[in-house]
């Protein structure tokens, strides 16, 4: 027979367990809101720096905080501007809300700072009338078998990275209008972004336009996981999930796990 003391101890233990669980959940939420957040990349606009289904670790504190960088609360107009703001560096890979569609998140490379004059001529970036250093270093063949020319680019601050351009097919250059643009004057408080996959990126050259600093969410740091296919498609049931588990495991890109996004040794 259970005594009143036994019941009291059981209830006390249950409350302690729920309290501990709630504490852990609160800490996890605070970490995601203020410190770091994982992102999944659905498109190839940053290929081959970032591939489709790469899982990115990003730091929320790198640029301070705005309404858009606070996970779970970004739909509530809590405040305007940024608090604890830190200026981004040219060449950063940034996760942000595009000003023309606040329902999605983009990830691109920051090229132009406020006050900059930006233009692309024959695929070469000119910043304030000075062309950046750009050297062809080889080719890249995508998982779909598409050939890209690979270039190493160096920005005025010394930061280097790789960009990619579709290789000409029978002498025909793809999407040449992306490589020869109008002049862009970056307004105060806004930034100019490009995708590393220069011929297949919706960036500041076309529909995206300039991105306000307020729209920045986080700075991308490294790839913590990567897979060629998505296992948890919304339109498949439990049986299909089980059947798809083996090919999903086999599709994991082991060579991309924990890859630093700013490493240009490869």
UniProtKB/Swiss-Prot annotation:
UniProt KW keywords: Cell inner membrane, Cell membrane, Hydrolase, Membrane, Transmembrane, Transmembrane helix
Catalysis performed (reactions): Cleavage of hydrophobic, N-terminal signal or leader sequences from secreted and periplasmic proteins
Coiled coil: none
Topological type in the membrane: Single-pass type II membrane protein
InterPro entries the record matches: LexA/Signal_pep-like_sf (IPR036286), Pept_S26A_signal_pept_1 (IPR000223), Pept_S26A_signal_pept_1_CS (IPR019758), Pept_S26A_signal_pept_1_Lys-AS (IPR019757), Peptidase_S26 (IPR019533)
Keyword Cell membrane: yes
Keyword flag Nucleus: no
A Gene Ontology term for the protein's cellular component: plasma membrane
Subcellular location: Cell inner membrane
Domain of life from the UniProt record: Bacteria
Main location: membrane
Entry-linked NCBIfam families: sigpep_I_bact
Miscellaneous comment as given in the Swiss-Prot or TrEMBL entry: Belongs to an operon consisting of at least secF-nuoF-lepB-rnc.
Protein name: Signal peptidase I
Provenance organism: Rickettsia rickettsii (strain Sheila Smith)
Gene: lepB
């Amino acid at each position: 027979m259970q005594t009143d003391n036994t019941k009291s101890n059981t209830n006390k233990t249950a409350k302690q367990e729920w309290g501990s669980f709630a504490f852990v959940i609160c800490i996890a939420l605070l970490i995601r809101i203020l410190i770091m957040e994982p992102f999944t990349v659905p498109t190839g606009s940053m290929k081959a720096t970032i591939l489709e289904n790469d899982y990115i670790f990003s730091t929320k504190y790198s640029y301070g905080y705005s309404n858009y960088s606070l996970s779970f609360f970004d739909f509530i107009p809590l405040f305007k501007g940024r608090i604890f703001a830190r200026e981004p560096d040219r060449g950063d890979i940034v996760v942000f809300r595009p000003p023309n569609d606040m329902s999605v998140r983009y990830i691109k490379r920051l090229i132009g700072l406020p006050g900059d004059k930006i233009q692309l001529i024959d695929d070469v970036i000119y910043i304030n009338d000075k062309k950046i250093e750009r050297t062809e270093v080889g080719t890249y063949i995508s998982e779909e078998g598409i050939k890209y020319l690979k270039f190493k680019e160096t920005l005025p601050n010394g930061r280097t990275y790789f960009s990619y351009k579709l290789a000409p097919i029978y002498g025909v250059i793809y999407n040449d209008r992306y490589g020869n643009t109008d002049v862009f004057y970056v307004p105060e408080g806004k930034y100019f972004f490009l995708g590393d996959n220069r011929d297949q990126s919706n960036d500041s050259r076309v529909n995206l336009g300039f991105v306000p600093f307020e729209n920045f969410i986080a700075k991308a740091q490294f790839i913590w996981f990567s897979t060629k296919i998505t296992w948890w498609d919304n339109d498949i049931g439990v049986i299909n999930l089980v059947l798809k588990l083996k090919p999903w495991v086999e599709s994991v890109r082991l060579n991309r796990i924990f890859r630093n996004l700013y490493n240009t040794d490869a």
